[in-house]
Amino acid sequence: MLVVGGGPAGLAAAAELGLRGVECVVLEPRAEVSHLRPRAKTTSVRTMEHLRRWGVADALRAAAPLPVAWSQRVTFCKSLSGRRITDFDNAFGLTTTRDDRFAEAGQQVPQPVVEDVLRAHIERLPGVELRLGHAASTLIQDDDGVTVGVRGRGGARYDIRARYVLGCDGAVGVTRDQIGARYVGRSDPRPNFNVVFRAPSFDTQLGPAVQYWVLGATSGLVGRLDLAGTWWAVIPGIEAAYGAAHASELITALLGGPVPHELVASDPWTAHMMIADRFRDRRVFLVGESAHLNPPWGGHGFNTCVGDAVNIGWKIAAVEQGWASPELLDSYEPERRGVVEQTVASAEANMRSLAGDLPPDGPAVQLAKRPEFHSLGLVLGYSYAGSPVVESTADHRDPVDVTNYTPSTEPGARLPHRWLPEGASLYDRLGLGFSLVGPLRARGPGVSTLADLARQKRIPLSLVDSAANQPFLLVRPDQHIAARAADAADLDLDLAIGHRVPGTHAVSTTSSSASGE
């Protein structure tokens, strides 16, 4: 296995593969992660649940410069020294109390910190090799694999042979072009300007917040990168040349007056709403920003990349380990494309009401911006219904309610989370492979039938007891529901691993022996 690119998507893919014992090499051109450009800052509750599975959620929280307890708020104001307009509490899934809806709260943390934590993690995984300073240059496919030309440190060139390649090399990487895919979509005509600055002596009287949206003559966003005086700012509508020449004036206006500060870095950028016309060519898969670009408003971009990596990661592991059909991989694009389309649409909707577009009126701001800061419906409520490996009567996904999350046991949905009486998460009881979740104490012959079938097919299956009045759920390694039935024997394992196409007859295998797994 070869992972091209060691940013968030590539590191997440390596973590997923390494968790499952699949050997892989990760090529990453950057020897070190730069902390001058923080990029994404929102790690969603869903991504934190994946980090929990990998065993690094606590490590990320320990490394995060802003503890969740410090603030869970987004504040709108005239300036950081001026009038408060309104607040959004528990933004981005930030909470210090347990919530039955998810196993992990969100975390505000700069992307470079996430990358550092994941780099350290995958370097400890047996069979995962992170080659820093190495970049892919060419990909040539044949029936048996992919030959990848690599440029190593010092310019040395060599080839790697891989059965599958995950292209996680972003917008400017080579993978998308090498397979002949292209972005389809548009770019926002407005420029944007980012600034990182140091102002150790400044503190706002508005109280702690993970973001301050300034609605004034100079409008934009400001936030802390740490609690030691490092700040970031985003000023929409500012050209690069003007921003570079007037950065100090812009900072002064946002803060509400002259404040001693030091400019650390600046970064002009443009928002893109782009999705590749295909996510796969035979043995090469596009993952993360190589497959899609979306505006940062709502904090979904980085998290969507992680979701891609998890989806293809467990599937390739299943194929490599011999318990799933290669046809399982055909489900990657249909499952993830729908999620990506919904996410890009939500981010674009958020972009229609940036700081300069909003009136300084609390109720109006609440109405316009609630879907941006309270988006659990999108983060947790997306479904893989209609997938070729999900036993669902639906042939499509209904649009999600971005704000409101309604737990569902419909096939394709994420398994509804709950905290168990002993204090553990239901998710901690799931296995690395598939899990049968249901009323095992009244198991009947169906549970043994399914367990025996899984054993015959070498499909890893864990048994998880649940409420007596619930149906049986076949839960995938990514915590999404593959099938639901009143009798466990009616759950279609063959469909879930790509061995049978939807609509064909499933043949049950009966057995008189009981499983004690």
Which ranges hold each PLM region?
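Conserved FAD-binding catalytic core of PHBH/FMO-like flavoproteins
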Residues: L60, A120, Y164, C168-A271
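A conserved short coil-to-beta-strand element within the FAD-binding core of flavoproteins
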Residues: L132-T147
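Conserved mid-domain beta->alpha element of the FAD-binding
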Residues: G6-E16, L118, G167, L263-A349, ...
